[in-house]
Amino acid sequence: MLPQIMFSILNFAASRGFAEDSADSSAKQLARKAGVRGETYAYWYLRREGYIVIARNFTMPGIKGELDLVAYDGSILAFVEVKTRAKAEPGQPTPEDAINLEKRRNLARMARQFIRARRLENTPWRFDVLAIETTAGQKPIVRLHKSAFSEHRS
């Protein structure tokens, strides 16, 4: 019940836009705020979909990047990369396009470290991508791609 309520509240807030407009904020700060809000939205979205989130913003010393969300989808451990963008015009890159080969390799390294650190070597796992496109005044468009890529595919 709580995930449904929280998701409804976030849907309302998201319809007002993820990034706050401010004359004092740089584009980078606005993008960071939108990303944080997108990850919070994704957290509640996944909970509503039945995922059990066990880690947020996981980092390891010496490895570039972070795992946005780590969650169980049933018995499968899902490493979820969240990408939030303002709605793209036709022909423009989508949020999913931001996950290039280097990003996938970094995510795979982080995932292997997470699995080792938690002693989850016998647990099946995959990489999911949750893309969020926002337009002020409208509900976000959410696309969840299960098994979006593997560490062995480029």
Regions found by a protein language model. Name each.
Residues 47-62:
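A short acidic/basic microdomain associated with nuclease active sites
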Residues 133-154:
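Short, low-complexity, polybasic intrinsically disordered segments
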Residues 1-40:
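Interdomain/boundary linker segments immediately adjacent to catalytic/signaling cores
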Residues 83-136:
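Catalytic cores of nucleic-acid endonucleases
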Residues 29, 33, 37, 64, ...:
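Residues at secondary-structure transition points
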Residues 46, 67-90, 107:
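Conserved catalytic cores of phosphodiester-cleaving nucleases, focusing on short active-site segments
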